[in-house]
Amino acid sequence: GNYASLSGNTMFWQVRLNHHATGAGRSMTAYKYSAHRTDPVVGTTDQRTMSGMWCDPIVGRPEWQFLGGGSAYGLYSRFGQATPRASGGFTVYRDDHWLLAGTGLRYGDQLGASLGAVGYETVGVRLGLDEYGLPVAMQADAAPQTEVVAFAPASNLAEGEYPASVAASADQCDLEFVAERLYGDTSADSLKRVRHGNAVMLTCRPAGESGGTVATIGSTDWVYALDDPAVSRVTTNVIDRLNREPLR
């Protein structure tokens, strides 16, 4: 089938649903940041069900293989010290893509900036530029037929960079956590590898020609900008296109 994700921080954590021995229902298990140390499935034949990041090497099923992007490549925008003075919009690159049909937007335009379409949590990709200067997904295990339409800068946050309201309880240290899990340590080099990310708009075909289309708009605050005519039109394009395409 087809799938649309109009949010950020989508599919960052794997969870497990456990049946109670009494038959009284199920519970959700999520060890999250401590999973690689404390989840009892680690070291067993079931360790791929560890309730940590989907992209953790122990799990080995990064969300970008389905969504086209993931929060390891940019988790926050305009939140704490993550791109605090960014425009709040996506910069358009592939202006001929069906996502942007009827918007009138052209290469270099801002989508949704006036109402802050890009903000809080995000989904991004490892970006590069092709021979035409257009963005492409660079991760080796990217979803097939990934087309990056627009993006905005985003970042993981380090200790001390969260808003005071969050830091008052405990800094999550996402920058250090992601660096350690993906690159094995929190050296300056590893931290830089997960510091400079993005919020992305893209489409992909995770199952190739035999499967459906996934449309990802990687920003939690997208919904707050629906009064922007271009944002509304993009949302309509997603719904109409994915409902019209035959299911595979």
Regions found by a protein language model. Give the residues of each.
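A glycine-rich, often tryptophan-bearing local segment used as a flexible ligand/cofactor-contacting loop or short
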Residues: G1-S114
